[in-house]
Amino acid sequence: MGLPKSFVSMSLLFFSTLLILSLAFNAKNLTQRTNDEVKAMYESWLIKYGKSYNSLGEWERRFEIFKETLRFIDEHNADTNRSYKVGLNQFADLTDEEFRSTYLGFTSGSNKTKVSNQYEPRVGQVLPSYVDWRSAGAVVDIKSQGECGGCWAFSAIATVEGINKIVTGVLISLSEQELIDCGRTQNTRGCNVGYITDGFQFIINNGGINTEENYPYTAQDGECNVDLQNEKYVTIDTYENVPYNNEWALQTAVTYQPVSVALDAAGDAFKHYSSGIFIGPCGTAIDHAVTIVGYGTEGGIDYWIVKNSWDTTWGEEGYMRILRNVGGAGTCGIATMPSYPVKYNNQNHPKSYSSLINPPAFSMSNDGPVGVDDGQRYSA
């Protein structure tokens, strides 16, 4: 016997009322924040991030931007159904244009012909369900690019640091500044804009790269120090691109090493991301270079672990988890142009994550990595 229509209508009205009240309750901070309260938050934020302005007019202009940022954050976080949170960070007083021009320094279009089939999906291939190169000691601590659009250099260096650790067993923090000062090309111009693969090519042509300790970061363009450029502590042999728009191939690559990627980071949600699994909104007009250092699944949601170069004050101590396995270009275009450096060992192939952390989960055949049933299986 069905329920009376009057009962169904009353139930719908009841739950609709509860939903409205819940949203109103969660968003109460939007209406309860007084101007004095927001001003106090702003002044605390200024102290935390060491911000100061030359005039009262500039202070007030930045305060208005801060208020809009805070409103966006409150509105976003009031929705308890969201998979991620946003929060106040060092970008809270910047306009969109200032943020883009200062922190987003990646440009696409270089060396698209060097696509390798090494990590093409193969029928029956099984991948680990979880990879985190941080736990294998192959990831240097979070760095900060500062007010320099050198994200391309940070991404390139992070993957070189990673493959060097995987092949040699030694983790060395390498010099982004050397790439910015000495690695300029027609398309790669230091703090202004750059290609990740131009960073790899510089290291190959130069015969190696110096350490961060010897050639420290300054967050600005400088003259190339030739003496320091000639000190070469880490080398790579070549670089390759993962098949484009193929998240399974990208996942396969990440089981063997951290991978450089680019994505669309221009939106407010990405800019102010603080925790959780980021699902957008974002497009696929890639403008920022980062590094994938792992992947996993939480609550049935697959994600990539992304290392950024915006200090530990952004995201999850400098990292982001971003939605994985959406197909095509991936979330925010993350699968559009993945690339990685190659450093040969006696097997001409890096050790897999599983072989370094757990008993080996892969064996090698003439066709590439072959897995055992401990994770995700690919089928055509």
UniProtKB/Swiss-Prot annotation:
**What residues bind E64, as annotated?**
151
Q: Which stretches of the sequence are propeptide?
A: 25-126
Description of activity control: Repressed by the active-site-directed cysteine protease inhibitor E64 (L-trans-epoxysuccinyl-leucylamide-(4-guanido)-butane) produced by Aspergillus japonicus.
What keywords appear on the UniProt entry? Allergen, Disulfide bond, Hydrolase, Protease, Signal, Thiol protease, Zymogen
Q: Is Signal tagged as a keyword?
A: yes
Q: Which residues cross the membrane?
A: none
What EC number(s) are associated with this protein in UniProt? 3.4.22.14
Task: From the UniProt record, give one GO term of the biological process aspect.
Answer: proteolysis
Disulfide pairings: 148-191, 182-224, 282-332
> Which residues are catalytic?
151, 288, 308
Cite the Gene3D superfamilies for this sequence: 1.10.287.2250, Cysteine proteinases
Tissues where this protein is expressed: Fruit.
Question: What are the boundaries of the signal sequence?
Answer: 1-24
Asked whether the keyword Signal is assigned, the reply is: yes
Q: Which reaction does it catalyse?
A: Specificity close to that of papain
GO molecular function annotation: cysteine-type endopeptidase activity
Its biological purpose: Cysteine protease responsible for the cleavage of kiwellin into kissper and KiTH.
Read off the PANTHER family from this record: CYSTEINE PROTEASE FAMILY C1-RELATED
Q: What family is this?
A: Belongs to the peptidase C1 family.
In Swiss-Prot or TrEMBL terms, this protein is called Actinidain
Source organism of this protein record: Actinidia chinensis var. chinensis
Give the gene that encodes this protein. Answer: ACT1A
